[in-house]
């Protein structure tokens, strides 16, 4: 198949879907749109980007607004109990016309999918296709040769493209294919994330809250859109780099919730339903380059493959 550009990334594909002269292909390994979980915080300036698609006000109407943050620490009288110690405005005045908001990543992606379907190109995502490898040939109108695997049938196909943009995350296969190397280290610190419906007497359950206990760790509490659901980021402590998989197996949904309940003492947390759960470790790494042209080749040719996104 010949596809002038091919993209792995929804924001960029949505932008290009407005141009009938540009043929774009959006490839996603999952078998369908994201339903729950993953990222949920949207900075003011990101909302401005969605407004460029005409979606900013729709997003703001649906989302939870983060107007302030409260802080809880161990009580000086009884360090087994927490108490509120501070309250601050979440974003400074004049930063943006839009607020800092919280909304499910699946909703954001659905906004963009709907935008693409209604665009001049009527662009649709291709689900169930996994990136395998690519190579850039020296000549030809479509020099980037990409191999894709159909997840359902395990069959492979080849796509020729003028350009490829890989927006496939921290473990980017596109980045690996062009030989770019991430610099930095995984911070050996883990967090459990739980989206839940719960009954609680904690007074700030509908405010963004940073909660520190004396001995049980820390929680970042994020209210979710809709008025009922809440997300807890629960501090799970340090990880032995050689025991990452065992660490994940040890920290189950139940154990993470139990940790959160201990952090919140003297308040109670009765979890009624868990919508999503994950354990992840914090890391900050940056790739040494963002395209397929090494520094020593920059005067010889223009790039054909790019990596972008988070």
Residue ranges: model-predicted function:
Residues 25, 274, 305-308:
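Residue-level marker for buried hydrophobic side chains located in beta-strands
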Residues 127-144:
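A conserved short coil-to-beta-strand element within the FAD-binding core of flavoproteins
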Residues 35-122, 126-128, 213, 222-224:
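Active-site-adjacent segment of FAD-dependent monooxygenases/related oxidoreductases
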Residues 1-8, 25:
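Beta1/beta-strand and adjacent pyrophosphate-binding region of the FAD-binding site
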Residues 21, 61-74, 79-86, 93-94, ...:
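FAD-dinucleotide binding site
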Residues 27, 167, 194, 308-310:
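Active-site flanking residues adjacent to catalytic metal/cofactor-binding acidic residues
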Residues 114, 163-286, 294, 300-303:
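Conserved FAD-binding catalytic core of PHBH/FMO-like flavoproteins
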Residues 12-40:
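Glycine-rich FAD pyrophosphate-binding loop
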């Amino acid at each position: 198949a010949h596809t002038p550009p091919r993209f792995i990334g929804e924001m960029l594909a949505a932008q290009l879907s407005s141009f009938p002269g540009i043929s774009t292909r959006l490839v996603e390994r999952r078998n369908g749109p994201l339903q729950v979980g993953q990222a949920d915080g949207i900075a003011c300036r990101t909302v401005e980007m969605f407004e460029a698609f005409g979606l900013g006000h729709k997003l703001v109407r649906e989302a939870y607004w983060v107007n302030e943050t409260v802080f809880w620490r161990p009580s000086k009288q009884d360090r087994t109990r927490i108490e509120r110690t501070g309250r601050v405005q979440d974003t400074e005045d004049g930063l943006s016309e839009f607020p800092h908001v919280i909304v499910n990543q699946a909703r954001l992606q659905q906004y963009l999918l709907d935008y693409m379907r209604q665009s001049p190109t009527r662009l649709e995502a291709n689900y169930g296709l996994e990136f395998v490898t690519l190579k850039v040939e020296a000549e030809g109108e479509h020099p980037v040769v990409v191999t894709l695997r159909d997840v359902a049938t395990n069959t492979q196909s080849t796509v020729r493209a003028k350009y490829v943009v890989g927006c496939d995350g921290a473990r980017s296969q596109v980045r690996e294919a062009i030989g770019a190397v991430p610099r930095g280290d995984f911070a050996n610190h883990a967090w459990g994330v739980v989206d839940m419906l719960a009954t609680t007497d904690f007074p700030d359950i509908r405010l963004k809250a940073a909660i520190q206990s004396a001995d049980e760790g820390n929680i970042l509490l994020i209210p979710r859109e809709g008025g009922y659901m809440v997300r807890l980021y629960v501090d799970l402590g340090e990880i032995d780099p050689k025991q990452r998989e065992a660490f994940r197996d040890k920290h189950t949904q139940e154990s993470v919730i139990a940790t959160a309940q201990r952090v919140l003492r003297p308040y109670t947390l009765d979890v009624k339903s868990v919508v999503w759960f994950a354990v992840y470790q914090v890391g900050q790494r940056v790739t040494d380059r963002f395209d397929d042209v090494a520094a020593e080749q920059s005067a010889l040719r223009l790039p054909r493959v790019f990596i972008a996104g988070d």
